[in-house]
Structures are given as structure tokens and as C-alpha cells.
């Protein structure tokens, strides 16, 4: 057996309706002013407002930034960083799929340490802990709530850059299966395939370890048994929760097994389909 090491220094809450614990978790982070980051689709559905109101009801100030596209760009990170600084917030809530979480991680770096996110491309270039980050996934796909990666599109190079550092791991993650129920079938399918491939790639990686293998095996089991059921009925909370936990385990597995990434400007799972 090759030498390996691992650390999962996060606080993860899993459960139906666990979004209600956001104010409690926010206070644990030590923050009093949230910068809530999401995408326009969730904003239109009223879910961003719901999350913001839960924080406000606990006496926490909130500013929102919802101008985040799929496969987010360096320019979006720059805009979000400027908005964060202008708001005067002291912690970040990433609410959505992989794109808001990737941008939130990047903003956690650039708002604290300055410069462009391009300056942190590569491995272990983030000098220290980022601004406190709470990640709340609304898809079972990227597992970004537990990964040490942020993937951002650099249009000047027509390239997706990757920041890899354990410093950008969200301090807290909330996994509420009820948030998955509004996803269209096509999105649920693509995200589920993305998560399964994360686990599969981690399992066959030359950098795999007994730890990442255990995570990958459980992820493939949960996703394989539940993806068809969930895509057919997104209101099936039991299947949704299994997919969400499978995605979580897959994210941990591929974060530690250091697998490949898709570089085309399309959802990864959709490319595989």
C-alpha cells in the first residue's frame, strides 16, 4: 500500500429541511454580514430570497449577487469580488450548483488576498485560509461543497483554469434534499452522471488511496441505485437525498484522488451523455 494522507476539516449537515439551520451555522462561522452568491435561475424561483430571509430573521445582514453564469468567467469573479468588498460582508454563502460555489471559492481568495484569480492558478498557491464560506448545493453533481477545486473560465486563453488548495474548502456545507426537487429532469440526469464519473475517475486514479476508494465505492453505489428513480421523480426525497450524499462522497473521492476535469464550455455530465 502506498503512503497516503487525508484531512476533511469541514462541518457538514445533511438532512431534509436542513436549510433552516443556515442562521445557526452562519453564527458559528462568526459572521454578521452575509454575501449570498447564486445564479439567476434560483433567484427567479424565489429560493435565494428564502435563504436571505432566513438569515435576516436571525439578525444577519445580507447582500446578494446572482449574476453567475454556467462555467463562470474570470470577469464574473472580478465583479463578484468588487461587490463583496463594496457590501462590507464578512462571510460568504454559496447557494446553487457548481458554478456559484466555484465563484464563491474564488472570491474568498481574491477578496482577502487581492489580485486576479488567475494569479492563484495551479496547486497550493493560496497563501492561507479564505473568507469563511458556507456551501449549499442545489444539485447532486459537482460535489463542490467538499472539494478543494475552483474551476473558472479564462476567455482570454479560451481555457478553464483550476485553483487547487485545501484552503478553499468551504468551512460548512448544508445538504438539504428538498432543494433538489425543482430541477428539470435533464439537469438532474446530467448532474447525476457528472457525480458518478467523478467517483469512477477517482476509483481508477493512480493517486487513489483506500480512503478515496471507500468514498468512491459508496458514491457509485448510491448514485447507481438512485439516479433513474430520481430523474423520473425529482420529488422523491429519499432518492434525492441518496443522490446528494453520493455526490458528496464523489466530491471527497475525486478531490483526494486528484482526477481530470472537463475543459469544454458545457456541463460535464451533459458532455458524457
Model-derived regions, located:
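An N-terminal, well-structured beta->alpha segment
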Residues: 1-65
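Short glycine-rich or small-residue beta-strand-to-loop segments that form or flank ligand, phosphate
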Residues: 34-39, 63-66, 92-95, 134, ...
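N-terminal beta-alpha supersecondary unit
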Residues: 37-46, 70-71, 206, 213
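N-terminal small/polar loop signature for handling phosphorylated ligands or for N-terminal nucleophile
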Residues: 43-115, 229-240
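Glycine/threonine-rich beta-strand-loop-alpha-helix active-site module
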Residues: 75-175
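Carboxylate- and glycine-rich phosphate/diphosphate-binding segment that chelates Mg2+/Mn2+
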Residues: 149-257
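C-terminal catalytic subdomain
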Residues: 257-273
